[in-house]
C-alpha cells in the first residue's frame, strides 16, 4: 500500500489492511468526534490554519525583539515539547545549522549552566531569551530564567544604570510564550508586570509534543531566517494532512495507514518497534518523535534513532531471531553526490528489516539543506495523527471503549517526579 501525499511517499509491507476496512469509518469517527473540541487536547488539528493568520504578527515580534535589545541571537529556555519541537523544526528546515542564531538551555546543574554561558563567551547581553512554559512554573525553565534575569540586571548595573533602568534594559531581552490568561500563568504575569514584548501564546488543548506549529516554534523559525512564504507553505501542508486525516477513506488517509501499521503489531503480540530516520537533518527529530511516542503510547517503548548510527549500536539486537519487531525507515530524496551510496544503504536496510516483520519506508522531498517546507509540514503533522490513531485502532479492534479524552494526548505519569519538586526553585528572584 502506498501513501498519496506529493511531499511524502510511503510503501507499507507485511500488514493486511483488508482486515481493517470494515472499521475505517469507526476509526475516523472516534477521532473526528473529539477533534478541536474544548478539553479534548486535540486543538492542534486545525492549529496550522489558525497560525496562518498570525504569520505577520510573529515576524513583526521577531523584528521588534531584535531592535529593542540590539542583538540578533536567541536562547530558548524551555524543556520537553517547548524545546524538542523547536529543535526538530529548525533542523528539518535547514536552519540554525551551526547554532548561529539560536541556542538552547534546559538544564539545572552548574556544569551545564557554565557550558551554556561559554557558548555566549560569558557575554549574556548578546542574546535574547524566549521563555516557554504553559504555566510559567516549569522547574527547569524557571531555574534558568531566574538566573539569567538576575545576571542581565547585574550586567546593566555594572554599566552604571540605576536599579530601575537595569531592570528595564534586562526586560528588553525577554519574550514569553505561555498561557494567554495571566490568572493561569505565572510567566504571563511576569511578562505583563515587566512590560516584556508580547504576545506569544501556547494555545489551549495543545500538548507540548503536539505543538510544532504553535507560537514558540514559528517564532524560532522566523528568528532563524525562515521566509514568510515558506512558513505559509509549511502550515498549508500541515493543514492538508489534518483535513485528509479525518477522511474515512484509507486511500487518502495516510495517518490512519500508519496508525494501523503500529497497532497491528501490538494486536499481534509484537511490542517492540523501531523507527529510524536517515541523515543528520533528523538528529533532533528523533528526540521529538521519541517524546511523542513514549508520552503517548505508554505501555511500550519504541526505539527512535538516526541511521547510519543506529546500525552500529542496535543492529545486533534488531537482527537477533529471538526478537520480534516492526520497522519504519524515513529517508530523504537524494539527488546529490552521495545518492548512489545512499540508495544502496537504503536498499540494504529495507531488505534486512523486511525479514524481521512488517515494515514501511517513507521517502520525503528535500531542499538543499533539509526538507521542503511542504514536506516539513506534512511529516510533522502526520506523526501526531498516526500516534493518536494507534490508540483508536487498538481499542476499536478489541471492542474496548475509548475514554472521552484520548490517553495518547495526556501525560499523567509525569507528575510522579514533578510532585517531588514541589519545594519551588531555589534561585535568585521570583516569578509572579
Can you name each region flagged by the protein language model?
Residues 1-432:
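Phosphate-moiety recognition in structured ligand-binding domains
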Amino acid at each position: 500500500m502506498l501513501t498519496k501525499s506529493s511531499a511524502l511517499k510511503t510503501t507499507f509491507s507485511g500488514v493486511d489492511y483488508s482486515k481493517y476496512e470494515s472499521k475505517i469509518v469507526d476509526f475516523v469517527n472516534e477521532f473526528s468526534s473529539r477533534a478541536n473540541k474544548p478539553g479534548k487536547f486535540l486543538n492542534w488539528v486545525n492549529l496550522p490554519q489558525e497560525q496562518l493568520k498570525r504569520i505577520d504578527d510573529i515576524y513583526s515580534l521577531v523584528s521588534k525583539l531584535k531592535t529593542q535589545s540590539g542583538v540578533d541571537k536567541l536562547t530558548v529556555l524551555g524543556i520537553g515539547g517547548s524545546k524538542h519541537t523547536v529543535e526538530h523544526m529548525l533542523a528539518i528546515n535547514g536552519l540554525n545549522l551551526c547554532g548561529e542564531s539560536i541556542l538552547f538551555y534546559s538544564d539545572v546543574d552548574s556544569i551545564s549552566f557554565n557550558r551554556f554561558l561559554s557558548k555566549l563567551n560569558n557575554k549574556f547581553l548578546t542574546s535574547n531569551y524566549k521563555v516557554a512554559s504553559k504555566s510559567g512554573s516549569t522547574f527547569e525553565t524557571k531555574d534558568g530564567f531566574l538566573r539569567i534575569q538576575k545576571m542581565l540586571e547585574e550586567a546593566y548595573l555594572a554599566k552604571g544604570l540605576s536599579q530601575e533602568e537595569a531592570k528595564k534594559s534586562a526586560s528588553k531581552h525577554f519574550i514569553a510564550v505561555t498561557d494567554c490568561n495571566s490568572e493561569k500563568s505565572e510567566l504571563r504575569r511576569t511578562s505583563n508586570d515587566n512590560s516584556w514584548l508580547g504576545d506569544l501564546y501556547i494555545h489551549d488543548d495543545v500538548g507540548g509534543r503536539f505543538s510544532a506549529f504553535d507560537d514558540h516554534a514559528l517564532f524560532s523559525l522566523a528568528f532563524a531566517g525562515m521566509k514568510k512564504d515558506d512558513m505559509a507553505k509549511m502550515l498549508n501542508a500541515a493543514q492538508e494532512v489534518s483535513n485528509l486525516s479525518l477522511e474515512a477513506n484509507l486511500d487518502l488517509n495516510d495517518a490512519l495507514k500508519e496508525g494501523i501499521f503500529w497497532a497491528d503489531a501490538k494486536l499481534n503480540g509484537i511490542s517492540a518497534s523501531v523507527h529510524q530516520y536517515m541523515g543528520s537533518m533528523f538528529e533532533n527529530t528523533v528526540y521529538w518523535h521519541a517524546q511523542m511516542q513514549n508520552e503517548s503510547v505508554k505501555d511500550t517503548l519504541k526505539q527512535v534513532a538516526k541511521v547510519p548510527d543506529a546500525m552500529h549500536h542496535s543492529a545486533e539486537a534488531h537482527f537477533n531471531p529471538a526478537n520480534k519487531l516492526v520497522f519504519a525507515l524515513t529517508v530523504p530524496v537524494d539527488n546529490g553526490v552521495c545518492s548512489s551510496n545512499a540508495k544502496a544503504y537504503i536498499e540494504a536496510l529495507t531488505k534486512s528489516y523486511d525479514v524481521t516483520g512488517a515494515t514501511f519506508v517513507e521517502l520525503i522531498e528535500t531542499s538543499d539543506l533539509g526538507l521542503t517546507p511542504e514536506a516539513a509540514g506534512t511529516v510533522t503533522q502526520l506523526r501526531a495523527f498516526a500516534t493518536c490513531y494507534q490508540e483508536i485502532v487498538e481499542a476499536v479492534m478489541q471492542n474496548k471503549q475509548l475514554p472521552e479524552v484520548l490517553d495518547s494526548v495526556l501525560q499523567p505519569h509525569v507528575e510522579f517526579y514533578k510532585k517531588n519538586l514541589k519545594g519551588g526553585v531555589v534561585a535568585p528572584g521570583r516569578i509572579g
